[in-house]
């Protein structure tokens, strides 16, 4: 019959191994999560989400109501729609997208699409302006100019000596025979 000493040793060894594995896993997680680029990306995503909600609010609450005052629009952009296929009770007409959809009509909601395009343009123009201001004040280039490779016609950095796609020299060495 086995004594308790052998199983106690095994239990202690297994417990020690498990503790070491937990410590290694925790250290690996800390190494991953505390790296500079992971924290920068996480912070950037959080700021980008907040920035996007501000621009979306600006577009939908300030810009689009002003655009809706134009004589040929005369309604909020998100309420603009076209009927592609009428529903069974169309004789009264549809005042809203919800009425048309409830009646079974096929609706093209182009106003919502136009609103999303204006949101995209607002976000991209604002980000471009912020990048330009950052470059002016920090003297660092974050928007890098690109040119097309003379040989493969792919976009590469204007400062590249060789194309990353086809490995050709950009200073004309390929042309000399």
UniProtKB/Swiss-Prot annotation:
Glycans are attached at residue 165. GO terms for biological process: terpenoid biosynthetic process. It is a multi-pass membrane protein. Its main location: membrane. The keyword Transmembrane helix applies. Keywords: Glycoprotein, Membrane, Transmembrane, Transmembrane helix. One of its GO terms (cellular component) is membrane. GO terms for molecular function: mechanosensitive monoatomic ion channel activity. It is found in: Membrane. Part of the gene cluster that mediates the biosynthesis of anditomin, a fungal meroterpenoid. The first step of the pathway is the synthesis of 3,5-dimethylorsellinic acid (DMOA) by the polyketide synthase andM. DMOA is then converted to the phthalide compound 5,7-dihydroxy-4,6-dimethylphthalide (DHDMP) by the cytochrome P450 monooxygenase andK, which is further prenylated by the prenyltransferase andD to yield farnesyl-DHDMP. Further epoxidation by the FAD-dependent monooxygenase andE leads to epoxyfarnesyl-DHDMP. This is Anditomin synthesis protein L.
């Amino acid at each position: 019959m086995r004594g308790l000493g052998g199983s106690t040793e095994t239990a202690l060894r297994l417990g020690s191994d498990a503790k070491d594995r937990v410590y290694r896993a925790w250290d690996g997680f800390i190494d991953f999560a505390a790296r500079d680029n992971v924290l920068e990306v996480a912070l950037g995503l959080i700021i980008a989400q907040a920035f996007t909600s501000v621009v979306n609010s600006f577009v939908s609450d300030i810009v689009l109501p002003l655009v809706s005052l134009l004589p040929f629009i005369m309604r909020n952009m998100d309420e603009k729609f076209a009927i592609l296929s009428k529903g069974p009770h169309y004789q009264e007409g549809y005042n809203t997208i919800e009425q048309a959809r409830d009646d079974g009509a096929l609706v093209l909601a182009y106003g919502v699409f136009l609103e999303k395009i204006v949101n995209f343009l607002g976000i991209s123009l604002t980000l471009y302006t912020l990048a330009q201001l950052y470059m002016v004040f920090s003297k660092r280039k974050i928007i890098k100019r690109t040119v097309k490779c003379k040989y493969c016609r792919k976009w590469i950095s204007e400062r590249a000596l060789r194309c990353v796609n086809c490995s050709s020299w950009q200073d004309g060495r390929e042309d000399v025979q």
